[in-house]
Amino acid sequence: MRVALGIEYDGSKYFGWQRQVEVDSVQAQLERALSKVANEPISVHCAGRTDTGVHATGQVVHFDTDAIRKESAWTLGVNVSLPDDIAVRWAKVVDEDFHARFSATARRYRYMIYNYQLRPGILRSGVSHYRTHLDENKMHEAAQHFVGEHDFTSFRALHCQSKSPNRNVHEVNVTRQGMYICVDIKANAFLHHMVRNIVGSLIEIGLGHQSHEWIPELLALKDRSKAAPTAKPNGLYMVDVTYPEHFQLPKLALGPLFMLD
């Protein structure tokens, strides 16, 4: 039997999604809890691996098991065995041809900026704090240059292992709600650090250090060293994964929960 799960987590205390030998990860905690409920070793596959300190409200995973359980066992039962900063949001038995990564047609991320001169007292691990005023309208205008299929070499990590730097960005929106700025980006897939590198350059534009024409210049240069530094991880959320309709996976509010959809 193959089961898909929707997962949310606060990545602050974890060394990313992927299971590692000597440090704690979201995957390791989830597999431990699932194995306890299934009474057999469980290995999960995710839609996209998140880095150290990055969060998710819409991560999707799947696993195979011989255990026969009610769907509530994979939600309520697993949540009992998970730490408070990881939770299963939904569970669904799926066909054998479903794959959390390879069946996905798009991923969506939101990067949350707290734009105020004084630091936040709450949500400090869930937002990135920038004291100097950012012009979200200029950031949004510049972000439209990313839409479409491009070579994102200037916006990938130097150690990115993806064979191709090409990605198709479906949409990017930069909006403000009071002191919060949200960079909302959807694409077929993302390169390592791609979202945070994009945000880093948009921040330079929001500060007035660069114009919106800088973005197409960076895309053409195909040189990571020419773009801005990588934005901090704590403002980044994986909020949604798109799959073909026939899988009929549950659709919940994207989050983060303090954002209005």
From Swiss-Prot:
The keyword Protease does not apply. Keywords: Isomerase, tRNA processing. Substrate binds at Y109. Signal peptide: none annotated. Disulfide bonds: none annotated. GO terms for molecular function: RNA binding; tRNA pseudouridine(38-40) synthase activity. Homodimer. PANTHER family: PSEUDOURIDYLATE SYNTHASE, TRNA PSEUDOURIDINE SYNTHASE-LIKE 1. Belongs to the tRNA pseudouridine synthase TruA family. This is tRNA pseudouridine synthase A. The gene is truA.
